[in-house]
Amino acid sequence: MASKGGRDKIKLESTAGTGHFYTTTKNKRTMPEKMEISKFDPVARKHVPYKETKIK
């Protein structure tokens, strides 16, 4: 059975251009703006900003 909640799956893509991404969920009602967070990119081997993109 599917969940009723307002959480949507999102993809956080690296801005370093390596193609690496993380997936997570986000509550669209409390955070309508696009997310940007600094996370570790194992391809670049350093912390870089990750920006929210749509899951295709």
Curated annotation (Swiss-Prot):
InterPro entries: Ribosomal_bL33, Ribosomal_bL33_CS, Ribosomal_bL33_sf, Ribosomal_zn-bd. Residues 1-40 are annotated as: Disordered. GO terms for biological process: translation. It comes from the Bacteria. Residues 1-12, 30-40 have a biased composition (Basic and acidic residues). Residues 15-25 have a biased composition (Polar residues). GO terms for molecular function: structural constituent of ribosome. Signal peptide: none annotated. Gene3D superfamilies: Ribosomal protein L33. Keywords: Ribonucleoprotein, Ribosomal protein. GO terms for cellular component: cytosolic large ribosomal subunit. HAMAP family: Ribosomal_bL33. PANTHER family: 54S RIBOSOMAL PROTEIN L39, MITOCHONDRIAL, LARGE RIBOSOMAL SUBUNIT PROTEIN BL33M. Belongs to the bacterial ribosomal protein bL33 family. NCBIfam families: PRK00595.1, rpmG_bact. This is Large ribosomal subunit protein bL33. The lineage of its organism: Bacteria, Pseudomonadati, Pseudomonadota, Betaproteobacteria, Burkholderiales.
